[in-house]
């Protein structure tokens, strides 16, 4: 049996939970992508969970739900904080605002010999539940540079398939 190669560095972490952290209130309309159409329903007590994610150093993005007509994403202390947007029809929404789901895509590197390597990039976008299943707000959350260094950037655009 062939021994698997050891992981050289921590993989970029992605965190998923339902209730937004108080830090989601840190954004203004000038420093996020997407829309904020209702208040942030976070706990009144800050548990320190966000500070723990920052301290861990490997968490690149956190994804939450709860506030169904918010779908924004913004970066705070090196971590992209992303609302999922309301998708289901079993809960509240906003008339005229298409239901949407946030998609997260993680691309892995492959060696010349076809072996899987580390994570190459993490991207996200939202898919609307409209007649065209429109893709909006595409962003690169994280990627590995050609020199092995990591960097993050934001690219915001609307793409129709």
Language-model features, listed with the residues they occupy:
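His/acidic metal-ligating clusters that form di-metal
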Residues: 1-71
């Amino acid at each position: 049996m062939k021994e698997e190669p050891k992981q050289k560095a921590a993989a970029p972490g992605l965190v998923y939970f339902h209730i937004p952290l108080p830090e989601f209130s840190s954004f203004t309309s000038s420093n996020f992508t997407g829309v904020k159409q209702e208040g942030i329903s976070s706990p009144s007590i800050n548990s320190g969970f966000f500070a723990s994610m920052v301290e861990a150093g490997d968490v690149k993005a956190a994804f939450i739900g709860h506030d169904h007509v918010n779908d924004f994403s913004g970066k705070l202390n090196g971590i992209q904080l992303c609302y999922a947007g309301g998708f289901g029809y079993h809960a509240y929404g906003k008339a005229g605002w298409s239901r949407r789901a946030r998609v997260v895509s993680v691309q892995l590197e492959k060696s010349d010999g076809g072996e899987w390597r580390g994570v190459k990039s993490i991207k996200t976008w939202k898919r609307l539940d409209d007649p065209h299943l429109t893709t909006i707000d595409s962003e690169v959350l994280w990627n590995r540079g050609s020199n092995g260094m990591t960097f993050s950037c934001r690219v915001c655009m609307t793409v129709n398939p």
